[in-house]
Amino acid sequence: MFKAAINAEVFKDAIEAVSTLVDEAKFRITKDSISARAVDPANVAMVAFDLNAKAFDTFEATDGEIGIDLVRFMDILGMTARDDRLELNLNEETRKLEIRTGGLAYTLSLLDPGSIRKEPKVPALELPGKIVLNGAELKRAVKAAEKVSDHMALGVQDKTFYVEAEGDLDKVRLEIPESNLISLQATSNVRSLFSLDYLNDIVKSLGKAEQVTIDLGTDYPVKFTFSIASGNGTVIYLLAPRIESE
């Protein structure tokens, strides 16, 4: 059983955090939350998504899981207005998700959870660098970097967080000293290189966050963590590095 109501914009932003990386996902539902874990087809990026029942106006559920075609789901959510109320109901007989919003009524066919790729385990990473900054700042850096290259370095050097991209002809570098960050902790200088294709997808959601925590090492995956739904949800992205040649 699953029946809930929530602000449409809040829910759309939450689901977008998953749909930026994968086209389908298995969502686990409990009496307290909705969660999902997914990895992209190339095994380069992973997302962990948790949305607490407190994010909803009403929330009634028993333990279960559903498979959702995120492309179709986001098409429906894209029809909602910012202040619309979104009502969700899992029809137990048809195994379809009934969606009502702004006078519109949709019925979304669900996927067999067993047909969806197995959920990944989120690795516990202890990395030497931890940077906290505004999501819009990181999004701006990614947008600048993609003008000159298809990959981007994230690093910390001498208490300064930097973003750097270098192409065949051009180079861009953004430096943010510790004083201009929300916080910075680093036991050593660190640097890793990442695909801008993935970063560009990730910042679509991450760029809206007031605070993003970046856990960073050298030639290690980067971990991005931020809150959604006014602190009633959390999204974690993990992105594998591109190893720089000497």
Swiss-Prot record:
Q: Which keywords label this protein?
A: DNA replication, DNA-binding
What are the protein's GO molecular function terms? Answer: DNA binding; DNA polymerase processivity factor activity
One GO BP annotation is: regulation of DNA replication
Q: Return any one Pfam family short name.
A: PCNA_N
| CDD domains referenced in this protein's UniProt entry, alphabetically | PCNA (cd00577)
NCBIfam families (alphabetical): PRK01115.1-5
Q: How does it assemble?
A: Homotrimer. The subunits circularize to form a toroid; DNA passes through its center. Replication factor C (RFC) is required to load the toroid on the DNA.
Report the sequence similarity comment from the record.
Answer: Belongs to the PCNA family.
Q: What does this protein do?
A: Sliding clamp subunit that acts as a moving platform for DNA processing. Responsible for tethering the catalytic subunit of DNA polymerase and other proteins to DNA during high-speed replication.
Name of this protein: DNA polymerase sliding clamp
